[in-house]
Structure formats: structure tokens, C-alpha cells
Amino acid sequence: MKVLYIVNMDENNKKGLFMATHEKIKAIMKLHPENEYKIISVQFKDTGLFRAIKKITGKKTYDKTSDEFTFDGVNYKKVYLSIDMKSKNIEKQEDDRARFAEFFSGCKEDIENCDIVSCHWGYPHGRIAYWINRDFGKPYIVTYHGSDVHTMPFNNSDIKKKVLQIMENSVQNIFVSKKLMDTARELGYSGDNCTASRNGVNTEKFYPISEEEKNEIRNKYNIKGKNIGFVGAINEVKRSDKFAEIFEAIKNLDSNNEYTFTVVGDGPLKSEVEKKCKEKNLHVVFTGNQESDGVRKFMNTMDVMILPSKREGFGCVVTEANACGAAVVGSNAGGIPEAIGIEENVVNDGEGFEERLAKRVVEVVNSNNDRDAISKHTMDNFAWEKIAEDEASFYGKGALN
């Protein structure tokens, strides 16, 4: 069987979506070497007047770079869609196939040769799969990861209509959490061609390290006492604007313990968070963005990791932290409760959220957490090899339809 993947992956931003998609595809390729695989990463480039206006106003422009990239032994072909005034107008039309002309002209042979299309990201990537089905008769599967369901369609009525068309005409819709699938129902999706299949964790990259290695990291970054961590983008969606309040509440609720707060990542609110934490005299270590090796080491030093997001697809970072032995306390957004799996460690949104989250963190810190047991449970239940088979099982179904 020949499988064509259409993905939303930026090699310069190897974070949640990139890694979740890559790990799943890599696991499928390993499990089913009898298949042939082609992966196309759809990216964007600003052109014409649209690009000129962005340059004049100092906004970030998207430019064409390489034609492909290889990561972790997997090759990705890159196809660029132009962003200009013409493309913006086409996007508003019901028949928007012309928006993807660059993809069809650059990938016609790949489309004709494949037996099934597996698309990772609802829009516009899933829309390409929709038109491949209409024009070439190829069946398709779409995996939805988060904001392609819980944000974009709710903010734009044109996108909403098109995402629903994508869902209704696919062989299978795969949602990374039950919550995300429920959100699709709220959107208006009524089909039964769906399943919830959580994301996994790469147990070769996330695992417990030795006490000697932990102490080395602690000493290097001046991590003292109990270490409460966060890993991810420092932005409003992750509720980063409330980090200082959460950290202060933890410190005040448990004055008998010394606390370090470790923030792994970067984002638009970093400077603001740093300033507020400094004003509150909190001991916070900001590490900046880290590759997986660095993330693993910091997670191993954490007593508890927090994930107070306002919205989330699944929350791969939860299982990664668990694989390293760290307990996690988070919000009830998206698939976070499913990833955490411990009801008491999920804090409902609402009044006093920050204080209630802090209270639960302190309770977990002062309980007897078996790091080895946490890690083993995660590795037994969230290994990518098990998760990947969920998607692969639909390939034959699609080819038969």
C-alpha cells in the first residue's frame, strides 16, 4: 500500500505538533515496512503586495527556504502555498480548490501513485485531502490535533463550513482526545466515521535519568528545594500570564519548603512573566527553548509539572513528564484530563483557579510519589508503537472503499 501524508510541520519549530506528528508517522513506518510512504509538509510563503505590506509594517514574513528536510531519518518534501490578496479571496469561496493549485501541480505524481491520503491537521491541510478525494478519487483520513477544531472553525464561519465538509467526507476522523471529538460535535459534526486516539510518548527520548545527572542539572541551573516546572510556549493560551500568581501561591501555601520554579520554553509573554516573578521575589529559572535531551533532563528534576492551559489538544508534554517520573497537575482543558489520568490532579476552571491549582501542587509535592511507578505506567500505556496502530488500522479500510 502506498500512503501519502500531508502534514503541518515546520522544521524550525520542533515542538508539540511537529513531534506528535513525526513520532506517529515514524512508528507507523516501523510497524508496517511493507507499505510505501511519501510525506509532504505544506508550508507558506508571502508574495506580492501582501508581502510588501507586511515588510513595511514590520510584521513577520513567511519565505520559501529549502525544498525538503530530513529529521530523525525521515524525509519530508516541502510544498509552498502562496499567501497574497488573490489567495485570501479564494479562501472565502465555497469552491476553493484553486487555492491549492501549487500543491496539485507540484504533487500530481505523488497523488496519482498513492492508495490513501493521511492528513495531519484539519485546515487547510485537510481541505487539500478533500479536493484530492473529489478530483482524484483517493480516500483520506484526517487527524485533528487541537486548534484546528477548538479554535479556528469557531472563529471563522468559512473555515467552519469547510472543516465540516472535510469531516463528513473522510474515511475516518481521528481526534487526539475524546474532548476534542466532543468539541467537533459542538461544531456541528454528526458523522460516525470518527475515533479518539491519544498521542503517545517516545520512550527512547523521555525516561528517568540517574541521580548524578539530576544533581548536575540542579547545580548548573541553581535549582534548589522542591522544583515545580512548566514546559511549553509562554503565551496566554497556556495561561502563562498567571504563572507569577500560581508560583507565589505555592510558595505561600508551603512556607516550610524551599521552592524553585523552572520554565522550559519561550514565547511572547516571557518578558512579562520574568518581570512579575522578579517583583514577587520568586526563584524562577527560565531555560529558553530546549531540544528533547534538555527537556528530558529538566523534567527529571521536577517534583511536579504544571499545565494550566486554557485550551489544549491532548497535552503530549504530560506523558513526557510522566515518563520521566514527574507528577503533573493541570487544568481540565481539552485532552489534559485524559493525559493526566488522575482526577484529583485535574483542576476545573473558574473562580480561584490559580489558588486551587497551587493547593493541589502542594498536596502532591508533600505526598509519597513513586517516580518509578509513574514512569512505568506511562511507558506501558503510551508507547507510540501502540498508539500508531490505531491510525494504521484504517489504511486498509480506506483502500477498500
Task: Enumerate the predicted regions with their spans.
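Carbohydrate-associated surface elements
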Residues: K179, G200
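Conserved donor-binding/catalytic core segment of Leloir-type glycosyltransferases
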Residues: L4, N222-K238, A244-E248, T262
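Aromatic "clamp/platform" in nucleotide-sugar-dependent glycosyltransferases that forms part
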Residues: K310
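Short hydrophobic beta-strand element within catalytic cores of glycosyltransferases
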Residues: V318, A327-G330
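Short alpha-helical donor nucleotide-sugar binding micro-motif in glycosyltransferases
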Residues: N289-Q290, K297-M302
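Nucleotide-activated donor-binding/catalytic signature segment of Leloir-type glycosyltransferases, i.e.
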Residues: S271-Q290
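A charged, aromatic-enriched C-terminal amphipathic alpha-helix characteristic of glycosyltransferases
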Residues: N366-G398
